Amino acid sequence: MMPFYPVGSADLDVPPNLIGRGTGVCVSAYTHTEEGYDIEEMEAQWAQTYRLINKIRHNKDQLARYETLGLEDAEVVAVAYGANARTVKTGVLEARRRGVRAGFVRLITLWPFPDELFARDVPYVVCELNYDGQLVREVMRSAPDGKKVRFMGKSAELNTVAEVAAGLEGVARTGRIPELPYIWTEVR
């Protein structure tokens, strides 16, 4: 049987693609040997997982996808992903129209996380479609001062443009998100 990648190869980053006509490859979720047989031994599981994790880490720049706006002069940066990102971006544009130097980061992929986007020492406002704050923890971990990261969580509906603009304006002026109905600002 043809191995999944050269046996004993030091280059374990990208095994050749064997899927296609005439290859006889069975695709499954099980960890497998170099020959393609399912295994349960921890050492082989670890080696396979290690290879995949390192493959992602070494190619982080190609895999992490995001969109940015106005980061060059930003005094406060809004962060969002998914369905919420569109209204947050419009809220950033509204805040800029009001004189707040607001920036925007839309994460398209969440892993690998683009830590380098959060290297600036400015407040970050993470707008999420939940009350728990899942993404905010990653931003807190990546930012130089996690205490400058603010959370605007909302459940059952998207943040409105007015809420985002008011939140960014509040953080830029006072360091706090103003009291807004249905907005959760504590990370639990």
Give the residues covered by each predicted segment.
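Flexible, low-complexity linker and terminal segments
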Residues: M1-R188
